[in-house]
Amino acid sequence: AIDVSLVGSEMCIRDSSGLDSSLKNGEFKLGVDLFSSEMNKGKHVISAILLKEGKSKGSRTVLDSTIKTKITDKQTIWFKKNIKNVYKWSAEEPNLYKLQVTLSDPFGKTLQSFTQQVGFRTIQINNGLLKVNGKPITIRGVNRHEWDPINGRAVTRASMVEDIKIMKRNNINAVRCSHYPNQEVWYELCNEYGLYVINEANIEAHGMRFHHNGYKQLTNDSTWSGQWIDRGQRMFERDKNQPSIIMWSMGNEAGDGKNFENLYKWLKYKDSSRPVVYEPASKKNHSDIAFPMYKDIKYLLKYAQSNKSKPLILCEYAHAMGNSVGNLKDYWDIIDRYELLQGGFIWDFADQTIEKENEDGDQFWAYGGDFDDQVYNNDSNFCANGLVAADRSPNPHFHEVKK
């Protein structure tokens, strides 16, 4: 099962921490939104403690601040502090701080308390390059579905840790959450172990390609605008404080139109610190990065030589189905030659097959057509595009990736 929690919160937090212009010092900036019908009964106390946890020397307190306030309506309380020579977060050096925020009533009773990770880092696009902490990065990424060979979409924390460790051991430094926001613990683990994350809104409309108006039927229909914003908003509000998330993706293969333009504006208004990307908008103003899929090497070469102002990152390439991924060296010879080409995400990480037993009692990996559904349409083995099998044993072409 997947955990689902509905919580009526009296306090929400917004961590906007980053680096100053020197890229050496941290700028801690925490907004605490308070709202409750009971907040007008005396002064409430909000405390914020920021700790740097060391492996050998224990925790060190960086911030310990308390604010007392009487709340008569929704209000935002700010905690700010400059931190000299801050430990910066990146995929290579995932330094984290621990934040504890507590709301107490006038009598000292704790009403709500949060603990979360804080990573100090900046994300910029300047001179046509995507930079983290002032340095251009190269994305050696994979697309990943949430998948378990026994439980399907219900994945455990232990399996997430295993996925991350496999990626890190094989020189993978980034993951695209295809094609929906993942469980919250996934981002916390990416913060901890060090993976760059592209978080993706659950907006997809493959089936509309069969409509006589195609994708534009929905993407330009204003009656669907609210649904577009809602899915982007839910992604952003839940995951906005995760330092591993360096980009927002508006969705996958859902065409393009006014609804995506509006979602782009909403996300940029709420968060100017991260790029927003979307594959069909790669050549338009509502994608900050060219984010194409399955473009050949000639396309990359032409783009790199055109002096474009946008960096290019392949959102999908090197489709890892069957005997495949043999052209990685050709791709990376070009990527390594041109700064404007900043990598890509292989499709995809793991086969989405499921363990099944045949009539002889032998276990096998089942896919479309193996579930007494031969009379129904299915995609056969098109769910088996992984660098690893469903049980995470490496497929032969995975060895090409580590090189």
Segments (PLM) and residue ranges:
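Short glycine/proline/serine/threonine-rich loop/turn segments at secondary-structure transition edges
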Residues: M39-G42, N82-L96
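Exposed aromatic-hydrophobic patches
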Residues: D73-K84
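Short, solvent-exposed loop/linker segments at the N-terminal edge
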Residues: L19-G26
